[in-house]
Each structure stands twice: as C-alpha cells, then as structure tokens.
C-alpha cells in the first residue's frame, strides 16, 4: 500500500549502449518518476523510454530519433511544472532502448511510496 510520501529528486548518470538498459529497477511498493533526461547519442539512431513489468509487458513512453551526436533534453511535462515527464507504476522497471549508438547523459528522478 502506498503511503503517499514523495522522495527528494535523485540525480544519476546514464550510459546506455545499443539495446536495452535498465535505468531504474522495479519497485513493488512504489511509483518511480523521471523528471529530466539529458544526454546525447554517439551515432544516429533512436532512444526509447519503456516501462516493462514483471510479465515483460511493455509500455513505450517515448521514442526519439537522433542524429550523430545530437542531444536530447526532456524535462517535466511542459506547462505543468513539477509533473514528471515519465511515470512508472509499481512493479515496472524503466528501460532505455537505444539503436545506433551509446546514449550518455543523466537523469533526475523521484519515488512515491
């Protein structure tokens, strides 16, 4: 059961080679939120943010086509300051799926218990 307590924002580095990289592990009793994702892709390709549950069902939350060395900056939902860009339900892990190159950057996230 959620206690409706919200954590402070946590920042961490992201390095995601071609394929699937778990950037936030699943938590059975908490929601995870990504407020900001900033970085670039080493060569042209796509970056997708995906929620995957324990049954391996996928929810694609966003896919972005990037050129060689092109940067990506995603922040809280536009016009709704403080509302996270990406939300992960209890039991879902956050996965960054890349094609073409390595995504290098950082993310800011929070947790609701």
Locate predicted features:
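Beta-strand-centric surfaces of beta-sandwich/beta-rich domains
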Residues: 1-113
